Each structure stands twice: as structure tokens, then as C-alpha cells.
Amino acid sequence: MSIQAPPRLLELAGQSLLRDQALSISAMEELPRVLYLPLFMEAFRRRHFQTLTVMVQAWPFTCLPLGSLMKTLHLETLKALLEGLHMLLTQKDRPRRWKLQVLDLRDVDENFWARWPGAWALSCFPETMSKRQTAEDCPRMGEHQPLKVFIDICLKEIPQDECLRYLFQWVYQRRGLVHLCCSKLVNYLTPIKHLRKSLKIIYLNSIQQLEIRNMSWPRLIRKLRCYLKEMKNLRKLVFSRCHHSMSDNELEGRLVTKFSSVFLRLEHLQLLKIKLITFFSGHLEQLIRCLQNPLENLELTYGYLLEEDMKCLSQYPSLGYLKHLNLSYVLLFRISLEPLGALLEKIAASLETLILEGCQIHYSQLSAILPGLSHCSQLTTFYFGRNCMSMGALKDLLCHTSGLSKLSLETYPAPEESLNSLVRVDWEIFALLRAELMCTLREVRQPKRIFIGPTPCPSCGSSPSEELELHLCC
């Protein structure tokens, strides 16, 4: 029978302070730092809003990582803390103990709260905090430095979440005193006018990851280009299912030119993903030549590109060090793959992931990319399913992977010889051909995880992935 440990003296002292909110408020200025975190956590748990309002005004650390304590924002708690910050920001003479530079509403630092109570007496905080934060994120707090509020934002619908709407209004009313910093911003279904309102409030230089979904390309370019140009610290830029209904190729070209000029300002961009790439067909070079920083990840998926678009991929230094290249479901069967082969040769020393699934590549085109592919010594993932391959072409492809010792996940289509007149797999024939392909592969190297066959699996509907056992269910 276990005996519950008695409360520590620190815990008892904190509980005593919280019994009388007036007493705890008057004691904040002189409260030992070792008591501050347990007392704050207890006030937070009991929702003593008045105590929280005062505690934030005397916060003795450079950062208050509230998001890791409050997984889901609670409106009344947020109001109490922001009220305390408002009272503080409007004072000419701030409390001598106040060191707060950052209110972090992201779920990023659980360790901060796990270190109480004893560890705080031994730690030299905020020196330990400074190791975790960069100068860019938390500059030295001078008299006129704005308070930084960090949050990741996902705009899904209108009306917005109550907490987010309140926070936006609070920051807007304190322009110059507060910077709303958003390292990750995702826009799903919010109308463009509401997204623009949000961008007017957010400190644009803080955005490192931006994802925009389901918008019209012409409206996006006309309405958001001026904001994108100011996101100078952007690392990841994703456009998913942005559409267009234009038939004027000349007008499309002018819009792409305007849009491409944005990339002249994005000197830290590492990932560019465009799902539904057809809008850039015939104009892709305008975008690629404006890229300022060598990309690590390029994803141009779903749609079609012209041969001139493919040629430009190997001609600019910004794509010379790619680690991840995804061209899935870009229809390539009508164009020469020599430009793609040239790109693979160029990035062979760095490429780790290559996804060419669903490109409808014909076996007659395959020879153009095999030399480049065979030199990709760092390749760990290769998706090549849903392409039209003969048995001979697949054997040739597998033999050209003999030097790719780091390959740990690879997928290939069923050979066309295993398909019947209805273009469906004849499983009896397929089993024999698959065994022959595996025998060919094992003669040159030992595969780790490999999937050969139609995707998704006709039995269970699954597609191969990192989480899926790579075998046919049938």
C-alpha cells in the first residue's frame, strides 16, 4: 500500500497565497522566483483570473509559453492575461522585475513548466532561456521594443474562433506596442478579404510557413501579392488546389510575371509546393528564374507542363541542390524526359526523395532518365507507381538502381503484360511476373521496402506509405 507524499513547503506556500487573491496580488512584486511558476500554474488551474492579470505584469522571465500550458485557448484566461499586459504596456515606468519579451501561444515548450519547483532555485534563468531563443525571435527588450505574441494560425471558416478574433482585435488596438508573430499561417476556406484583414494585423516578417488553399490564381495574385513580398523570412510556401478558369494565355503570362516578382524578395525560401500546376504551364521559367535561394524541396503536382517548362528546371542554380522532388500526377507522356534526366544528373549528389507517381510515363521515355537516376546515391524514397511500363522496361529500371544503397522505400507499377483486355490486373500472371522482377532486383541489391503493383490496392484501397506494410493484400 503506497503512502502519498506530503505536500512540499513551496506548494503549501503557494496554496496559502491563492486562498486570498488580494494577498497574492500584493505579494507579487516580492514573490521569490522559485514560487512564481507553481503559483502561476495553480492560479491557471483554478482560473483565478485576477491573480493571473497581476502575475503577468511582474513576470520575471523573458518568455511566457502559455500555449504549452493551455493546449486549447480559453477566452477568459486569455482576456485576463491580455488585460494585465495592456496595463503594463500603457505604463511609462514598468515594474523593475518585468522581463517579459514574448507571449508564446504555440504548443512548443512543455519543458518550461515541467521544471518546477526545485529546479528553478538552481537554474540561472533567463540565461537558460536565451539558449533556446534566437536573437531574431526575441530581440533585447528596450524601452520602445514591442511585445511579441507568437501564435500559429489556421483560418478555416468565418466567423473566426472567438479567441483568435479577440486576439486580433487586441493587437490591432495596440499597433506599435505589440507584434503579432505567426511562424505558420494556413488558410483553408476563409474568403480572401478576411485573409487580407488578418495579414494587415500579423507582423509579416515573422511568417516562415504559409499555406493557401482553394483560391483563384488571378484573385490571389492581384489581392495578396503585396503581402507576400513582405514575408522576407518565408521558408515554406504552399499553394494547394488554387484554380483558374482563364483561356487567355497572354493574360496568364502577365499574371505569372507579376506573381514571380514576389520571389525576388524571398531570400530564405526552402520549400515551394504548387498543387494544380497547370496555371504555370508555358510560363514556369518566369517563376524559376526569380528564385533567390537554393530550394531543398520542390513539389509541382497535378496537371500538365510543357517541354519548355521541364527544360528550365535544370538551367537555374536555385534548383541545383534539391533534396526532395515531387512531380506526381503531372502528365509527362507527351514530352521528352531528357530535361528531367538532366535535372536528375544535376541534383544526383543531394536528392533524397523522388516522386514520379501517376505521371503516365511510357516505357519508351524511360531511357532518358535512367542515367541520372542511377547516380542519385543519396536517394531513400522513390515512388514510380501508376506509370505505363513493360516487363523489360521495369527490369531495366530496377537494374539501374543497383548503386542506390540507401533506398528504403520504393514503388513500381504492375507490368503491362499482367493487364487483361480491360486494363485490369490478371493476378495469376502478375504473381509470376512480380516474382521475376524481385529476382532481377535481388541480383543487383537487396531491397528494404518495395511495392510492385497497382495503387491503390484493389482489395483494401490503401496506397503504399511509410506507415503501410508494402505487400499486396490480394
Swiss-Prot record:
One of its GO terms (molecular function) is ubiquitin-like ligase-substrate adaptor activity. One of its GO terms (cellular component) is Cul2-RING ubiquitin ligase complex. GO terms for biological process: negative regulation of apoptotic process; negative regulation of cell differentiation; negative regulation of DNA-templated transcription; positive regulation of cell population proliferation; proteasome-mediated ubiquitin-dependent protein catabolic process. LRR repeats lie at residues 15-38, 204-229, 271-294, 319-342, 391-414. It comes from the Eukaryota. Keywords: Leucine-rich repeat, Repeat. The keyword Cytoplasm does not apply. SUPFAM superfamilies: RNI-like. PANTHER family: PRAME FAMILY MEMBER 1-RELATED, SIMILAR TO PREFERENTIALLY EXPRESSED ANTIGEN IN MELANOMA-LIKE 3. Belongs to the PRAME family. This is PRAME family member 14. It comes from Homo sapiens. The gene is PRAMEF14.
